[in-house]
Amino acid sequence: MSDEIVWQVINQSFCSHRIKAPNGQNFCRNEYNVTGLCTRQSCPLANSKYATVKCDNGKLYLYMKTPERAHTPAKLWERIKLSKNYTKALQQIDEHLLHWSKFFRHKCKQRFTKLTQVMITERRLALREEERHYVGVAPKVKRREQNRERKALVAAKIEKAIEKELMDRLKSGAYGDKPLNVDEKVWKKIMGQMEEENSQDEEEDWDEEEESDDGEVEYVADDGEGEYVDVDDLEKWLADSDREASSASESESDSESESDSDSDEENKNSAKRRKKGTSAKTKRPKVEIEYEEEHEVQNAEQEVAQ
């Protein structure tokens, strides 16, 4: 009843939100009007139950007014934030206006669509305005910037080449153990790289040595001495032969005994040298040398002849 009285007053008398067009149609400037037309159904003042969509600081909200909150003007409108996703926002409108009239559901969706399109257009215009600042660059300035970029790239390549050459010189030791004008951190970095390279080279050399040892021929000393004639046995045999030959001639026996003693000493010295050589160098091939004299062979032949 009160809504009808308010509409009669607005329609028949004066309303500050109403605008009359030259063609006779009336429009409403109220920010809560869902259609923008001055009609009984779309007037926010003449309807105690009303719903609309409004934009606030770039965000869209669904506003709802009910008679239960008419006595509290500070809490008259209930505001619900709508999702940025278009389909989800439409679902929110349907959920909150489920028991409302079809007119408000349809007009709220229509207003939400229009406001979404307006926001998209505003963003496009803002982007175009920002792009215009970059379009108005003079060709001379553009060429100058391109030349600077090209020169900067060339300078960067030269600097890298110089840095590489200096690093190679530092590693090779061209500047001594530690140059005076080199930062300590850089020097430690270079020394660390050199140590890593040396360790890698040592590992590679060790691997190569292990690989080269495969199939290598080595000569080692034999533990069994059964094949060689014992020196003591040889001395006994020579002593026996000397005793038998002494009965033939005393002069020959004296000379033979002296020569035998000399040969015995030489054989002992050679045997000691051979033993020392084998103990000191076990991994080298062993060579044994035997010394023989002609008069020993002659004595042996004489004994055989007798």
Curated annotation (Swiss-Prot):
| Basic and acidic residues biased stretches | 234-245
Ranges for region 2 X 8 AA repeats:
213-229
From start to end residue, where is composition biased (Acidic residues)? 194-233, 251-265
- Mainly localized where? nucleus
UniProt keyword Ribonucleoprotein present? no
Asked if the Swiss-Prot or TrEMBL record annotates the protein with the keyword Repeat, the reply is yes
Pfam family membership, one: Mak16
Q: Where is this region: Disordered?
A: 194-306
Placement of sequence repeats on the sequence: 213-220, 222-229
Q: What does this protein do?
A: Its role might be as part of the apparatus concerned with the nuclear events of the cell cycle.
The entry's family comment says: Belongs to the MAK16 family.
This protein is called Protein MAK16
Classification from the root reads: Eukaryota, Fungi, Dikarya, Ascomycota, Saccharomycotina
